[in-house]
Amino acid sequence: MEPQEERETQVAAWLKKIFGDHPIPQYEVNPRTTEILHHLSERNRVRDRDVYLVIEDLKQKASEYESEAKYLQDLLMESVNFSPANLSSTGSRYLNALVDSAVALETKDTSLASFIPAVNDLTSDLFRTKSKSEEIKIELEKLEKNLTATLVLEKCLQEDVKKAELHLSTERAKVDNRRQNMDFLKAKSEEFRFGIKAAEEQLSARGMDASLSHQSLVALSEKLARLKQQTIPLKKKLESYLDLMPNPSLAQVKIEEAKRELDSIEAELTRRVDMMEL
């Protein structure tokens, strides 16, 4: 028989033994459940064996105690003609209490020499238990404080998480809005670029001078701006010349020439812009 089938058979026999006449609950038979139930059956078997050994040992000790008690009873009867049956009700209660105490303290007999060490050991165990109980109590108080602090921290963290989620949601909305605006601007930029290109192609087909193109006009505008910047120090220099007494007519002529050159450039730029608008 295969090991798996053998385990299933052992498990089935164990379950039948456990439940007896009662129906066995349904369960899925697979290697995993079989392994778990087989492990439980083995542990149950070991436990039953240990319990059986303990019971047998207790039976043997009980038999020994009964024999010893009978021997002591016979000895008392022979020596002092004493029997538990001859005791009063109070004496019987005292005797039973003495026996119960000996059993509870696990002494070998009811002598004072056995009771005193047993009571001392029990007292020591009591003090150790109290000390351990105090340690556990202190530890529990620490755990309660730590738990309270942890709960407060958890609440703060939850609030921080909520705030972070709200901030993240707001920022995400802003990013989405910016992305939409950027896409719109890109689309418009492409639209304008194609529109400018189409207009330039139309103007070129109509015989427009290439110097009137958008790029040329931009370059010309930049050149004009540079020239204006260059004329600023010249104007300042000429203004200083105007303050000089010698030969003011010549300085005035130079100024007029510079003005005419600047007006000519501005007129040319205006003309080209006007032609572009047509």
Curated annotation (Swiss-Prot):
Protein name per the record: HAUS augmin-like complex subunit 1
The UniProt family comment states:
Belongs to the HAUS1 family.
Principal place of residence: cytoplasm
Gene name of the record: HAUS1
Q: Coiled-coil region(s) at which residues?
A: 49-79, 124-177, 249-277
Question: Which Gene Ontology cellular component terms are annotated?
Answer: centrosome; cytosol; HAUS complex; mitotic spindle microtubule; spindle pole
Known partners and oligomeric status: Component of the HAUS augmin-like complex. The complex interacts with the gamma-tubulin ring complex and this interaction is required for spindle assembly. Associates with microtubules. The interaction with microtubules is strong during mitosis, while it is weak or absent during interphase. It is unclear whether this interaction is direct or indirect. Interacts with EML3 (phosphorylated at 'Thr-881').
Q: What else is known?
A: HAUS1-depleted cells retain functional cell cycle checkpoints, but the depletion decreases the G2/M cell cycle compartment and induces apoptosis. The protein level remains constant through the cell cycle.
The entry's note on the tissues where this protein occurs is:
Widely expressed. Expressed in pancreas, kidney, skeletal muscle, liver and heart. Weakly expressed in lung, brain and placenta.
Described function: Contributes to mitotic spindle assembly, maintenance of centrosome integrity and completion of cytokinesis as part of the HAUS augmin-like complex.
Q: Taxonomy-wise, where does this protein's organism fall, top ranks first? A: Eukaryota, Metazoa, Chordata, Craniata, Vertebrata
